């Protein structure tokens, strides 16, 4: 039932656990397949049940001899979904860095992917955005794996019931004030119940189309200078830029993506400059304009480096020399 088992074997795996249906199914499937892993759970302290969920996670860890990391989050007043996600991934990535995990495993399933596709479609999206989350997602220091992405929630529930495995139901998943829940209950769940096999097949076709339509561009690095050779397809270049930022835990806004289509240089999150420089797309830290040595300034001018990249390159002689050779 698991996708990409070969990427999990003989690796250090960290499972994002909640004690809910999805992550509990993944936990027992990992055990069933003799894959080693530890778990991490976040207690947002919003429900009385959360204490029971943490206790269950610790009970499983003791029974099956793996580590259980628990993080107690501070109260979130507003924008719960986005802030909870940020807290969760910050915790996971800290554990990955400290304990040298190779993979982060999440229990996203076909229903999650379909919800995302519908939400993107309603916002305005191409086939890349609608294909959405992938089973294998390379990040800067680890690989994010979603081994259940081909399975529907009902298939996971049947597995748990058949084996009499305990799991918890989170009542907040029924609260339609959250947009994802609204899409789930009104649209994706009824459609999956009626057209499951067709929807699975459609995602297979979408994944094939994305591979054909979008070039696989790999970014390179010299210090804090990130670069790749432009594909001469704005669409492919923007997807490569987007993937790089996702790999370091940053998201590009829709407005920033729109600017990347028409501008030669765009500032992302007020921290990064993205620029077409010669035949290359370059990403650097963004420094505000400052005094630059005359010789360096002239060198940057002759290289035709965009002004918003110059302050960083003036501060990093190695990156500047590397870019000079690259553009020669």
State each model region's role.
Residues 1-185:
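Core alpha/beta nucleotide-donor-binding catalytic domains of modification enzymes
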Residues 6-11, 18, 138, 203-328:
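AMP-forming adenylation/ATP pyrophosphatase catalytic core
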Residues 81, 194-198, 292-297:
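Short, charged, solvent-exposed linker or helix-capping segments at domain edges/interfaces
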Residues 121, 148-151, 190, 206, ...:
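Generic structural signal for hydrophobic core residues of well-folded globular domains
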Residues 123, 127, 192-196, 250:
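Alpha-helix boundary/capping and short turn/kink residues
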Residues 149, 172, 176, 195, ...:
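Generic alpha-helical structural element
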Residues 182-199:
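Conserved anion/nucleotide-ligand pocket segment
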């Amino acid at each position: 039932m698991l996708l990409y088992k070969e990427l999990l074997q003989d690796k250090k795996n960290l499972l994002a656990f909640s004690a809910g249906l999805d992550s509990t199914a993944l936990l027992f499937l990992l055990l069933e397949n003799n894959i080693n892993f530890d778990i991490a759970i976040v207690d947002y302290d919003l429900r009385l049940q959360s204490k029971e969920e943490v206790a269950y996670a610790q009970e499983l860890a003791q029974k099956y001899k793996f580590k259980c990391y628990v993080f107690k989050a501070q109260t979130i007043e507003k924008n719960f979904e986005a802030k909870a996600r940020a807290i969760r991934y910050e915790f996971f990535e800290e554990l990955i860095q400290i304990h040298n995990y190779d993979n982060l495993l999440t229990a996203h399933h076909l229903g999650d992917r379909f919800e995302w596709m519908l939400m993107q479609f309603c916002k305005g999206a191409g086939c890349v955005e609608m294909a959405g989350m992938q089973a294998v997602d390379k990040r800067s220091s680890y690989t994010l794996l979603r081994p259940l992405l081909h399975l529907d929630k009902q298939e996971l529930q049947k597995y748990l019931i058949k084996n009499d495995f305990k799991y918890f139901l989170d009542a907040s998943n029924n609260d339609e004030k959250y947009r994802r829940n609204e899409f789930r209950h009104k649209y994706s769940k009824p459609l999956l119940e009626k057209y499951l096999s067709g929807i699975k097949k459609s995602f297979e076709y979408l994944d094939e189309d994305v591979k054909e339509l979008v070039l696989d561009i790999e970014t390179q690095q010299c210090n804090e200078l990130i670069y790749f050779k432009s594909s001469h397809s704005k669409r492919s270049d923007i997807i490569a830029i987007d993937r790089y930022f996702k790999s370091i835990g940053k998201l590009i806004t829709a407005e920033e993506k729109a600017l990347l289509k028409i501008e030669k240089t765009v500032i992302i999150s007020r921290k990064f400059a993205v620029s077409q420089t010669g035949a290359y797309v370059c990403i650097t830290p963004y420094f505000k304009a400052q005094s630059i040595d005359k010789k360096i300034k002239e060198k940057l001018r002759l290289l035709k480096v965009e002004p918003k990249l110059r302050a960083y390159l003036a501060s990093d002689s190695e990156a500047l020399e590397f870019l000079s050779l690259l553009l020669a």
